Amino acid sequence: MISHLLAAGFSGAIRALTGARALWRCAPSADHRVYYGNHVSHGDFVMIWSALPPALRRDVRPVAGAEYWQRDALRRYLIREVFNGVLIERDPAQRKRDAIETLCEAVDGGSSLILFPEGTRNQSDEPLLPFKSGLYHLAHCRPELEFVPVWIDNLARVMPKGKLLPLPLLCTATFGDTLRLGADEGKEAFLARARAALLALSENGAGGAA
């Protein structure tokens, strides 16, 4: 009960601090989905999670780096009890099991996921880094999954590196059309298509913001 109240409080706080709004090009759905977005800050998954309709949030789990979220008791509580995150070790040598198996287990348990296929926060001048292969491997293992690109705009300026408090600016999470792995689609083709779909939602992409 306390965790649910905290989750609702976090969602409200994020919307108040960032002026967050969600723009949907696909219809919100309780179907198993993977929401994948651009990665500019540790607040990214909270932004996407907060932008989802309340009825969907309980079944949507963020995929997060274990080394960051297990540093202290508060972070461990938040990621486990409030956000119900799926923790992945970034260093393969530290992993006790395959990361894709862990994600498939979460999906098989009835969850949708939030993840960031760039693999690390983008601190470059490029709008989007190349995608890691994990997005394809998850799609290959569970081809029935729908993948939803989500472009987060302005969060890097709301939560700038080195600042203790967020700066109030308007943030937008734009949810694009769903896509699935094609029957004969290879890794490079799928990753390129998924990346292009996400980039098209940005102000710098071909499609522009919704």
Could you tell me what each predicted segment is?
Residues F10-T18, R90-Q94, D125-E126:
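Short, flexible loop segments at the rims of nucleotide/cofactor-binding pockets, characterized by
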